[in-house]
């Protein structure tokens, strides 16, 4: 199975810049998409259901903000929208497709730029979910935008990010 992941930073602009061509070129079974910045009900069918894919989306309540999506060639057995805690679900940050023996999820971590405490709370709640996942007899593939840098090399301006979680 081939899985791809991309942060589009706005699905409409990404489509204008060639996202649908990129999607076709990937020939992936599942494509995880983050930062849609659009309500799915406002999108054209060419974006919702590109040729050969079924699209699934979790919108943020706030217009023009976050949102995640999955493009799947094979229809999943189940789709899980959100994680059951307000910040994640209202901001459209987690979407999971369940297949027979594994699950594929797309994930968008808050950046923490405006509210580091909210990001820390989110990470604590997300860790609880990851611990639950670890106890299940299932394989997970989580793709996404984590907004976490492992090393200073991973940051464009590491000195300015020393106080951001």
Annotated model-derived regions:
Residues 51-54, 125-165:
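Metal-dependent phosphoesterases centered on the DNase I-like endonuclease/exonuclease/phosphatase
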Residues 20-24, 93-100, 125-138:
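Short amphipathic alpha-helices and their capping/turn segments at secondary-structure boundaries
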Residues 1-49, 54, 60-66, 81:
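N-terminal, active-site-proximal structural segment of metallo-dependent hydrolase catalytic domains
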Residues 37, 44-110:
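Structured beta-strand-rich core segments of catalytic domains in phosphoester-bond hydrolases
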Residues 1-9, 101-113, 143:
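Active-site-proximal beta-strand elements of phosphoester/diester hydrolases
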Residues 84-85, 108-124, 159-164:
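Surface-exposed cleft-lining segments at the edges of enzyme active sites
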Residues 12, 40-42, 64-65, 112-114, ...:
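Short catalytic/ligand-binding loop motif for oxyanion handling, primarily in non-cytosolic enzymes
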Residues 11-15, 89, 118-126:
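Soluble or luminal CAZymes and related metallo-dependent hydrolases
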């Amino acid at each position: 199975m081939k899985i791809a992941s991309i942060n589009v930073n706005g699905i409409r602009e990404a489509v204008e810049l060639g996202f649908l061509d990129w999607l076709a070129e990937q020939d992936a079974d599942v494509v995880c998409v983050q930062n849609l910045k659009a309500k799915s009900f406002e999108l054209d069918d060419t974006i919702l259901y590109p040729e050969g894919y079924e699209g699934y989306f979790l919108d943020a309540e706030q217009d023009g903000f976050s949102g995640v999506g999955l493009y799947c060639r094979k229809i999943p057995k189940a789709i899980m929208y959100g994680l059951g805690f307000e910040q994640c679900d209202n901001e459209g940050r987690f979407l999971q497709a369940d297949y027979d023996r594994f699950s594929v999820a797309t994930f968008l971590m808050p950046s923490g730029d405006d509210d580091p405490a909210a990001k820390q709370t989110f990470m604590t709640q997300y860790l609880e979910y990851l611990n639950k996942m670890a106890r299940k007899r299932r394989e997970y593939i989580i793709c996404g935008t984590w907004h976490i840098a492992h090393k200073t090399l991973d940051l464009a301006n590491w000195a300015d990010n020393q106080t951001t979680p």
